[in-house]
UniProtKB/Swiss-Prot annotation:
Its target is unknown, but this toxin may modulate voltage-activated calcium channels (Cav) or calcium-dependent potassium channels (KCa). It comes from Conus araneosus. Expressed by the venom duct. It holds the Pfam family Conotoxin. Keywords: Amidation, D-amino acid, Disulfide bond, Gamma-carboxyglutamic acid, Ion channel impairing toxin, Neurotoxin, Secreted, Signal, Toxin. This is Contryphan-Ar2. The modification Cysteine amide is found at C62. The cysteine framework is C-C. It comes from the Eukaryota. Residues 1-23 form the signal peptide. Residues 24-52 form a propeptide. One of its GO terms (molecular function) is ion channel inhibitor activity. Disulfide bonds join C56-C62. It is found in: Secreted.
Length: 63
C-alpha cells in the first residue's frame, strides 16, 4: 500500500508541474492581443479611393 501511495503522489506532482508549465491558455498576451483584421479588403478600397480622388488625366481608367 505504501508504494501505491508514493506512486499516486508522484503522478499528482508531475501533473501539477505540467499544468504550471503549460498554463491555462488564458495568458495576458492573448487577452491584450490586437484583433485580426476582420475587413481584409479595406486597404485596397482605400487605395482605390485615393486614386479616384486624385486628379487623373485618363478618366476612364481611374474609376
Amino acid at each position: 500500500m505504501g508504494k501505491l501511495t508514493i506512486l499516486v503522489l508522484v503522478a499528482a506532482i508531475l501533473l501539477s508541474t505540467q499544468v504550471m508549465v503549460q498554463g491555462d491558455r488564458d495568458q495576458p498576451a492573448d487577452r491584450n492581443a490586437v484583433p485580426r483584421d476582420v475587413n481584409p479588403g479595406r486597404a485596397r478600397r482605400k487605395l482605390m479611393k485615393v486614386l479616384r480622388e486624385s486628379e487623373c488625366p485618363w478618366k476612364p481608367w481611374c474609376g
